[in-house]
Every structure is written in C-alpha cells, then in structure tokens.
Amino acid sequence: MLVHIPEVLSRDQVRHCRELMARADWVDGRITAGHQSAQVKRNLQLPEGTPEARELSELVHGALSRHPLFMSAALPKTIFPPLFNRYDADGEMNFGSHVDNAIRTVPGTGVRVRTDVSSTLFLSDPDEYDGGELVVEDTYGSHAAKLPAGDMVVYPGTSLHHVTKVTRGSRIASFFWTQSLIADVTRRAMMFDLDMSIIRLNADHPDHPSVLSLTGLYHNLLRQWAEV
C-alpha cells in the first residue's frame, strides 16, 4: 500500500530546509546502510547529530505529528528521527534494489524501532532533476513516485524498492521509518481504508447513524490489534 501524503511541509518550510542544507556538510550515504544495502547505495547524507540535521529532523517530526493522513496511514507508535539524503547527477547517484533493515537503533539512545512503514519526503521539485524516481515493488507490480517538494509517500517497510539514477540536477529528500501500532501490513491497510471510508461518509452524510457505528468498529479493531 503506497499512500501519497500531500503538503507535509509548506513551501516556506521547504525553503527553510533547503537553506539549512546548503550550509551543511554532506557525507557518504553508506554510513547508515546495512551490509546488503551498502553494496548498491550511492548517495550523500547529512550526518546525524549535527546542528543542521537535528533542526531539520525536529521540523519534519513536528509536521508529521500534525498531519492526519500520515497518522491514519502509519498509525505511528515510534518514529525514527528523520534523516536526509541527496542524489547528484555528477556522481551518477542511485540506490539499487533493496529491502530496509527490519530493526533500527536510534543513535545514542539504545531505543530500537521496527521499520513497519518506510517514508520519503521530497524536498526537491520534480522539475529540478531528471531521474531519481522512487520505485516500490509489490504483488501488483512496480510503482514510481516523484512528488512535489513538501509531499511524501509512505509504503510498507517490507517492500523491495530502489531509486533510479539522477541524470540532471539534485534530488533532496528526508527519509525515515515508523514502528506502527499495528505491525501487520494487511490489517494496517484495512484500518486505513476503514478510516478513509468513515471520513468520506461523515463528509457526505454527517448525521448518518453508520458514522457512529463504523467509528466504534474502527476503535474496537484498533483496541484488538494495537501493540502499545
């Protein structure tokens, strides 16, 4: 299940992020890759723990907690502190097919996060670069995402995915993982579909008695399936 989440960041917030990144020093992105991923990863990354990275991470984390569509799609229990990467054309940068590590440890804390949901928040507009599509594979085929700056795509952490080679410009993004209250991807997708159906029904028929009964069903399923 891929979900496009629009306007996670405003244009002003994106501009602020880009200004911070312009002052920062970038390093080889393989510093956060697992053994398998490091063999196919060619990009740059902001080092964790720098003042710029901390401010950017806090900005993105705050925006996520205020976005109802992300909360519905991911049902977050723990969000790994957002990271930031860049793919440049002059380095022929790309990220070959891989699956994200199942468990991530938050640096300096010992807190472990199960990567149920993967997210990419675009910080470059599509016309700023060629290539650089995020391609996610599932049982229904391949799905490519190349979204406006400030928009985000979320998808199951179990998915095989890759980033195509950037041939012009630079692709800048934030990426992170979420441990969901519901680990099972099928149950999580069902809850998202149910929540969206309730929202649409309430918008069209706010006094319909099914709004209340379906809302009760949603919370009872969450009570049964959630890990807290």
UniProtKB/Swiss-Prot annotation:
Residues the entry annotates as binding Fe cation: 98, 100, 161
Cofactor or coenzyme needed: Fe(2+); L-ascorbate
SMART domains per record: P4Hc
Molecular function terms, GO-annotated: 2-oxoglutarate-dependent dioxygenase activity; iron ion binding; L-ascorbic acid binding
Residues the record lists as binding 2-oxoglutarate: 171
UniProt record, GO biological process: DNA damage response; intracellular iron ion homeostasis
Fe2OG dioxygenase domain location: 78-180
PROSITE patterns hit by this protein: FE2OG_OXY
Gene3D superfamilies: q2cbj1_9rhob like domain, Rabenosyn, Rab binding domain
InterPro entries registered for this protein in UniProt: Oxoglu/Fe-dep_dioxygenase_dom (IPR005123), PKHD_C (IPR041097), PKHD_hydroxylase (IPR023550), Pro_4_hyd_alph (IPR006620), Pro_4_hyd_alph_FE2OG_OXY (IPR044862)
Source domain of life: Bacteria
Cofactor: binding details: Binds 1 Fe(2+) ion per subunit.
Pfam families per the UniProt record, alphabetical: 2OG-FeII_Oxy_3, PKHD_C
Name of the protein in its database record: PKHD-type hydroxylase RPE_4577
The organism of origin for this protein: Rhodopseudomonas palustris (strain BisA53)
Organismal lineage: Bacteria, Pseudomonadati, Pseudomonadota, Alphaproteobacteria, Hyphomicrobiales
